Amino acid sequence: MGKVGRIVYPDTCILIYWLERNSTYVDAILQRLRPALESPPILVFTELTRMECRVKPLQTDNQIQLAAYDRVFSTPGYRFEKLTREVFDVATELRAQYGLKAPDAIHLAAALSSGCDEIWTNDDRLAKAAAGRIGVFNVKERNVTYT
């Protein structure tokens, strides 16, 4: 394995698109991951991400899909950010300033507090709130912006 690459916080939708092979977005996600093969990104998650990903497989009793998510969340080298009071304080400020939904504000606050280089999302409001604070890969636009 090569040197460690950038630190990336994938929004829940990115993981769902990737693991469920969403025909609209999976190619853009794989293209973004491909240059990282020599220096793979460190993916950062929270228990909120894990919870959101596991809901549908549990509702539909899809044990194969559930196991796939559980494998990702137990991959060595990936990190879990603790949701501390400080993370929630930042999330509260982001929610108040940008009108984010609570989970999106928590995701962005976790990405910022864990020192991520990029957040990957499909959510325009989340991307706008993240702009200027962290690199943003907007899967819809298929580009990364740093400001």
Outline where the language-model segments fall.
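Acidic, PIN/NYN-like endoribonuclease modules and their adjacent C-terminal/linker elements
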Residues: 1-7, 35, 79, 108-147
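Acidic catalytic patch
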Residues: 21, 49, 75-97
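A general structural signal for well-ordered alpha-helical segments in protein cores
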Residues: 26, 50, 66-69, 88
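Alpha-helix capping/helix-boundary segments
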Residues: 14, 49, 87, 107, ...
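Short, well-structured N-terminal submotif of metal-dependent ribonuclease cores
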Residues: 1-45, 58-67, 138-147
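Helix-adjacent hinge/juxtasegments
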Residues: 60-81
